Amino acid sequence: MTGVQTCALPISGLYEIRIGTNILYTDAKGDFILQGELIDTRARRNLTEERVEKLTAIKFDELPLKNALMQVRGKGERKLAIFEDPNCHYCHKLEKEIATLDNVAIYTFLIPILGENSVEKAKNIWCAKDRLTTWSQWMVHEKEPAAATCDTAAITANLELARANNITGTPTLVFTDGTRIPGAAPLRRIEELLTASAKK
């Protein structure tokens, strides 16, 4: 248990319990625990979902962008960070999906969480002379990255960053307003979130 929240709940006598980013509810004595979502039917809002989104928000400005592959398309006025594993099927799908995104700076944090082969591929990509081309060739065209060696402390740091922010799956997209989307979102949704986060 990481904390008990005793405020901002609209029901008297109901308290929030947080376990990581999971939310449970209890009474004042802790005799009962309720697992599920708290819905405000009048406002048609899922209060549990809103709370989890707030708890999992990532401060984009604090991301160590030097540890990411950076790709600028057009003016790069919009920004997007993506945590990806080179062997993740949905990451491959996402890379093909976002190929047409324009006016965006994309920061890809390599987090090889799917086994030793992922670690090897991530290192080969990070150590390549042309990281972006090597990444794109592998993710979009399935061209195996050539063996390469260099300092891979950035990959270790990325894994620690993912753990600290409870990023347990790939891809995970992070927008400048802190919004986090797990999974390969459709292009239309990504465009909407890029536009919305740029206005905040």
Label the predicted regions.
Residues 2-9:
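Short, small-residue-biased leader/transition segments that mark boundaries at the very start
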Residues 21-50, 163-164, 169-170, 174-200:
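Non-catalytic, surface beta->alpha helical segment in thiol-disulfide oxidoreductase systems
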Residues 49-62, 171:
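C-terminal low-complexity, charged extensions that often adopt amphipathic alpha-helices
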Residues 76-151, 161-168, 196, 200:
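Structural alpha/beta surface segment adjacent to cysteine/selenocysteine redox centers
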Residues 154:
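A detector for short metal-coordination/catalytic motifs
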